[in-house]
Regions:
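Local sequence-structure signature of Cys/Sec-based thiol-disulfide redox active-site neighborhoods
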Residues: 1-28
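Non-catalytic, surface beta->alpha helical segment in thiol-disulfide oxidoreductase systems
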Residues: 58-85
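Short, glycine/charged-enriched secondary-structure capping and boundary segments
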Residues: 19-21, 48-49, 73
């Protein structure tokens, strides 16, 4: 499984997301993938999973099926997300 966070790099929530990813990595040893919705590949990812609110975290299985999605703030707890990492 993998966890992806979709957020706009130039936004008011970017610092919060970066801090969360750093804390998540330190706590679990796993990385969260980043997607910028302003890039062509990021826009395609957002259309695929119907992501319209930022930040959004999404847990995907190995075949790309969505397992869980957390939209907006507050961000989910590290323990909630670590189950899927």
């Amino acid at each position: 499984m993998r966890v992806v966070v979709v957020y706009k790099y130039e936004s008011d929530h970017a610092r919060e997301v970066l801090d969360y990813m750093r804390d998540f990595s330190r706590s679990t040893g796993h990385k969260i993938e980043e997607v910028d919705p302003d890039t062509p590949s990021g826009a395609h990812f957002c259309r695929t999973y119907d992501i319209v609110e930022y930040p959004t975290m999404i847990a995907l299985d190995s075949s790309g099926r969505m397992q869980q999605m957390w939209r907006g703030r507050p961000l989910p707890t590290i323990s909630e997300v670590s189950f899927y990492a």
